């Protein structure tokens, strides 16, 4: 059954435009409260990133949940994976995150976690959607939900992150720069690394509600690259606005993406005989990652793009490690979802164990040239299905003679068509990608 409101990563859009409006959030809170309360006593955690609209939507959700008879525990600004963790540890029925992840401040969204800290099953999302289309009724006064605030949420999550590494871990002597994207990690991330002994320079940790992801964080790496070089740091770590993506910069200023991080983590677990099964990537994962893992004897499979698909594949195979080149990295041995701080800690641990720099660690993964271009798509006929586009993709695939890949897909979170071409000749790859992007642009017009 097709969902009306929920996309691949919850509900997301422009603030003030349906469905990202206060009245919809009120109804969504009520519908979610009714759905979860139908399963028994109901307590729901609500957290958010640092967008100014988060206050407005937090109040609306709080009112709707209470009207349905659900008790609410407010966490304030917290990373998305922290809300998943706290939902489990407080034995709540669900967790709600108010965030649009790596998008600018004028977007916002909602995503849910189950009581186990995992993505909601489709059947519960469909139940919520069905209730959204029903008349809103308020429970009698004696059954209204109560609202409280958890004041030590940050401290609890900081201790959890530190517990993901051995108690003897000490990063003394390691000089790092951390870019918090003026987002949800602005308090907890610097504390985690400092308390583990690292010398930390902090960037973009002064959120004002409007500057989240604004030329900073994992989608704008230039500031971090410059700071790593200026500070003569060993490496830099960049988070996105809600703390579920991480990218790094080595001491030379080179960007280390999700494929690199996934390889470093998987290789470390494999060498210590602690890798359960293989590794899950996505259709966008670089071919070089697949080949490098194969050289180590590590199985690799591709899921659809989106962390929920990576997680679903991991669960189906009972594997532990997966991720996307955008920086979503899942380590099931520690978490139930992608957690940027946890992933960064596992990389730092690997570097310490092998006594190598981040630049040295990434050299073992030889990537194929890959070009990704985005084409604005406002809706209407799917350009990927257009005969001319299909024919062009087939022509490019033939031209690369089995030495590359072509992938066109619609973004699940933004109005974009993503054009990816990968092969062993960078000039050829870029030319093919630009030609395909131009054709898709013409078709969209």
Swiss-Prot record:
The chemistry this enzyme catalyses reads:
alpha-D-glucosamine 1-phosphate = D-glucosamine 6-phosphate
Q: What is its EC number?
A: 5.4.2.10
- SUPFAM superfamilies attached here? Phosphoglucomutase, C-terminal domain, Phosphoglucomutase, first 3 domains
Entries under InterPro entries matching the protein: A-D-PHexomutase_a/b/a-I, A-D-PHexomutase_a/b/a-I/II/III, A-D-PHexomutase_a/b/a-II, A-D-PHexomutase_a/b/a-III, A-D-PHexomutase_C, A-D-PHexomutase_C_sf, A-D-PHexomutase_CS, Alpha-D-phosphohexomutase_SF
Q: Which residues are noted in the entry as Mg(2+)-binding?
A: 101, 240, 242, 244
MF GO annotations: magnesium ion binding; phosphoglucosamine mutase activity; phosphomannomutase activity
Keywords associated with the record: Isomerase, Magnesium, Metal-binding, Phosphoprotein
Cofactor (UniProt): Mg(2+)
GO cellular-component terms in the record?
cytosol
Per the similarity annotation, which family is this?
A: Belongs to the phosphohexose mutase family.
Please report the name of this protein according to its UniProt entry. Phosphoglucosamine mutase
């Amino acid at each position: 059954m097709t969902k009306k409101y929920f996309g691949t990563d919850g509900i997301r859009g422009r603030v003030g435009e349906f469905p990202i409006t206060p009245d919809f959030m009120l109804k969504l809170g009520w519908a979610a409260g009714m759905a979860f309360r139908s399963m028994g006593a109901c307590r729901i955690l609500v957290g958010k990133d640092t967008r100014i609209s988060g206050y407005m939507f937090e109040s609306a959700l709080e009112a709707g949940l209470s009207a349905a008879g659900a008790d609410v525990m407010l966490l304030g600004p917290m990373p998305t994976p922290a809300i998943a963790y706290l939902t489990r540890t407080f034995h709540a029925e669900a967790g709600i995150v108010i965030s649009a992840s790596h998008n600018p401040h004028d977007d916002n969204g909602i995503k849910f976690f189950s009581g186990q800290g995992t993505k909601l099953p489709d059947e519960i999302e469909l139940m919520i959607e069905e209730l959204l289309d029903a008349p809103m009724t308020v429970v009698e006064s004696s059954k209204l939900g109560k609202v409280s605030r958890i004041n030590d949420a940050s401290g609890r999550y900081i201790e959890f992150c530190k517990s993901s590494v051995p108690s003897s871990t000490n990063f003394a002597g390691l000089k790092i720069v951390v870019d918090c994207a003026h987002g949800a990690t602005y308090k907890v991330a610097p504390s985690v690394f400092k308390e583990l002994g690292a010398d930390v320079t902090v960037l973009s940790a002064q959120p004002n509600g409007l500057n989240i992801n604004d030329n900073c964080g994992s989608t704008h790496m230039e500031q971090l690259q410059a700071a790593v070089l200026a500070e003569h740091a060993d490496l830099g770590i960049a988070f996105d606005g809600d703390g579920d993506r991480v990218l790094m910069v080595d001491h030379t200023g080179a960007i280390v993406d999700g494929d690199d991080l996934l390889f470093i983590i998987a290789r470390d677990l494999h060498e210590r005989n602690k890798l359960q099964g293989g590794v899950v990537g996505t259709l966008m994962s670089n071919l070089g990652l697949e080949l490098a893992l194969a050289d180590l004897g590590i199985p690799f499979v591709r899921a659809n793009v989106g962390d929920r698909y990576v997680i679903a594949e991991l669960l189906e195979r009972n594997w532990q490690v997966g991720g996307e080149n955008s920086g979503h990295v899942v380590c099931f041995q520690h978490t139930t979802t992608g957690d940027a701080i946890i992933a960064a800690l596992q990389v730092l641990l690997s570097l310490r164990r092998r006594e190598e720099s981040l630049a040295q660690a990434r050299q073992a993964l030889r990537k194929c040239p890959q070009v990704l271009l985005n084409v604005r798509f406002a809706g209407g006929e799917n350009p990927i299905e257009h005969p001319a586009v299909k024919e062009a993709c087939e022509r490019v695939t033939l031209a690369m003679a089995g030495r590359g890949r072509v992938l066109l897909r619609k973004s699940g979170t933004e109005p974009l068509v993503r054009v990816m071409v990968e092969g062993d000749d960078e000039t050829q790859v870029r030319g093919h990608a630009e030609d395909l992007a131009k054709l898709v642009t013409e078709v969209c017009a």
